A protein has these predicted regions:
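Active-site pocket-lining/capping segments in soluble small-molecule metabolic enzymes
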Residues: 8
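Non-globular, low-confidence helical/coil segments that flank catalytic cores
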Residues: 4, 15, 22-299
């Protein structure tokens, strides 16, 4: 409705000049080009209005992917609403109640603990939802899947009904760990924080990601060894690297985190090598876990 307030008053001008320019173009391309100039700027104005409307609070609803039972219930309620609008006198109240019920049916957020490892090809991408309702995402990129963020990661998040990521963990800045994250930032999906290691290499990829985060209002956090992101009874603790470990290798300085709650524990390793794994064992930083993400894609 709001968009129509801006679109409808000048759509007649757009159609008139567009058709006129088409006919004039049969005689003179130059003259038609002059007529198409205002058409171009009207369309640019429409695009700006649409982009602005999408950015308004509540403009985009992420409902999640419902199961077949909810879809069946959705169509039954929809049919009842349509039938009632024809038969009942108090239509408005019934329609309002029906619409509210439809929204309730279509709202499908993730509930309870969940860990998903996404198929992103040559790369990494994992989603973790805690019992408290906090959303974590670990890395997110690929070198052999085109637009992995647009066509795999973002559809996954929307299908799960995830409206935002609270903490997006970046183990390091290789393309197969951040290419999808960059696409999701550019899609203006809400990410509250991006988390790096305190010892992340300050390279071009890191600076590019910082610039994107600043553009889209995402806060940057850095974790040192021993730092913990707490979430009720759960915690995500940095166990590597620490200030004593020196390397110029981006993979070797991957941020390694240990997640633990009362029923589950897991280690997320990035692309560390066997040398860093041995370091974790020798310094007793790993411990036994329920889940271990094979380092460097299992290499």
């Amino acid at each position: 409705m709001l968009i129509n307030f801006f679109v409808l008053p000048i759509i007649g001008v757009l159609l008139f000049l567009g058709h006129l320019g088409g006919f004039v173009g049969l005689l003179s391309v130059r003259a038609a080009g002059i007529l198409f100039v205002p058409c171009h700027w009207i369309l640019v104005f429409y695009e700006k209005v649409c982009r602005l409307s999408v950015s308004l609070p509540g403009a985009v609803w992420i409902t999640g992917q419902p199961d077949w039972q909810k879809l069946l219930l959705f169509y039954l309620i929809l049919g009842a609403v349509l039938f009632a609008t024809k038969k009942m006198k108090q239509r408005r109240g019934f329609v309002f109640i029906g619409c509210f019920m439809l929204l309730a049916v279509l709202h499908n957020p993730v509930k309870g603990f969940e860990l998903d490892v996404l198929d992103v090809g040559q790369g990494d991408g994992m989603y973790l939802h805690t019992k408290e309702g906090t959303n974590f995402f670990f890395d997110g990129g690929s070198t052999d899947v085109s637009k992995v963020g647009t066509y795999r990661m973002l559809p996954f998040l929307k299908a799960k009904g995830v409206k935002k990521i609270d903490y997006w963990i970046v183990s390091h800045t290789d393309a197969d760990h951040i290419s999808g994250l960059k696409e999701i930032l550019q899609a203006e999906y809400e990410i509250d924080h991006i988390v790096f290691s305190k010892y992340v290499l300050n390279d071009e990829a890191y600076q590019e990601l910082l610039a994107l985060a600043q553009t889209y209002g995402t806060e940057i956090l850095k974790m040192d060894c021993g730092d913990t992101l707490t979430d009720g009874e759960a915690g995500l603790r940095c166990i590597f690297p620490d200030k004593t470990y020196k390397s110029d290798d981006k993979n070797a300085l991957s941020l390694v985190l240990r997640y633990e709650d009362q029923e589950f524990s897991g280690i997320f390793t990035g692309d560390i090598s066997s040398a860093e794994e041995q370091y974790l064992v020798e310094h007793k930083k790993a411990g036994s876990v329920t889940f271990y993400k094979a380092a460097h894609h299992g290499s």
